[in-house]
């Protein structure tokens, strides 16, 4: 299903639920508003992940399908039975390099967002099975920044660069992941819990 259609359907369902008098009676106003906010945020997050993954896949299949591999990655490590994942992995098979991505519909830098990207066992697994991890990135809706060797890139900027890279003769991944970004330290959070907004 198209991302726009998914969003239209989910928005209509959330609105119907919000207008349902029985649900209003069961839930307090704060609970209802928090639920609606979280549901909207959840849907937009999934859509952003799917758009980024699909556009990256299409671009690198167009450039050289034998050289580049793009996928989601979710595994359980054998050595410690730990579940780890990346929203996207981009592999340059020719160079033996990997790039790991988390995609977040958020404008906040939250330390928990990078727990898998900082997992040394996971990074070793990637090095051994896909190619040396060259860069770890979070694509999100905030300003570009770099924190603890993890690059935070604005998702809209990434998609614009992706469009340019797809039309460039002999493109390089580094053109897409330009690390010349704001390295100032924004406000950091340790969790991603949000307070309910009053509607």
Q: Where are these predicted regions, by residue range?
A:
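Structural motif
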Residues: 80-81, 93, 128-129
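Catalytic cores of nucleic-acid endonucleases
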Residues: 96-98, 105-158, 183
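Accessory nucleic acid-recognition modules appended to NTPase machines
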Residues: 1-86
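Polar/charged alpha-helical tracts
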Residues: 15, 21-24, 66, 124, ...
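Domain-level recognition of nuclease-like catalytic cores that cleave nucleotide substrates
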Residues: 138-199
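Short, surface-exposed, polar/charged, turn-prone segments marking secondary-structure boundaries
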Residues: 34, 117-119, 128-131, 163-168, ...
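Generic low-polarity alpha-helical segments
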Residues: 2-8, 13, 117-119, 136, ...
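Conserved catalytic cores of phosphodiester-cleaving nucleases, focusing on short active-site segments
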Residues: 52, 56, 86-110
